[in-house]
UniProtKB/Swiss-Prot annotation:
Name this protein carries in UniProt: Sperm microtubule inner protein 8
Deletion consequences: Deficient mice are viable and have normal fertility.
Keyword Cytoplasm among record annotations: yes
Originating species: Mus musculus (Mouse)
This protein's record includes keyword Cytoplasm: yes
GO biological process: flagellated sperm motility
Record's subunit section: Microtubule inner protein component of sperm flagellar doublet microtubules.
Disulphide-bonded residues: none
Amino acid sequence: MAQIIDLVPWDECSAHLYASPAVLLPLERVRHPLAGVKHQLYHPALPSLRRMDMDTVKGCLSDEHCQSSTYFSKDDFNKAHFTLLGVPNKPLQCLDFTATGQKLCHKYRGGKMIPIAPGINRVDWPCFTRAIEDWSKFVSRSEEFKLPCANKRVEGFSGYAVRYLKPEVTQNWRYCLNQNPSLDRYGQKPLPFDSLNAFRRFGSHYSRINYLTPWH
């Protein structure tokens, strides 16, 4: 949005001999409380974690913080839409160009391949995945494997030391350290912001900050 300002005001009786210059000045955007305009889960312009952190460091109030306010109006939230991506119903046209693509086309036309997963336009959508059936078939087809020996106190996986939930008191302390980044059942935990800044501090608390002093 912009506002038009006329720089040359004219009288109603005066004769216009030249064009009046105009300047477009941007208007200040109005922030709305997020609770007053957002009534659904989807946010069309979700603020980034960096933007929220910057507003928190600046000490913005709730009517200026991007976590609790937005420039969008209620109509923008009601008209917002999104598209869920799915597997396309039609194969790519470039599959006939390469030998691998021709082989896949022949297998699919001959009925030797599993049919393509349903796309967005299918009636039975949403069917994101058949994970339960696939997992049961995978487990039933897999062979038996030997479990590790239970008498072994310390086990290592991919360079990580593991331990039992109830360790003995005499066990070595180094296995109590947490790896960084660490993992949980949902995946990798967020990395702390100061984990890479260990022993990397500009200057000292007890001396002058040298990196802010001009060298000339």
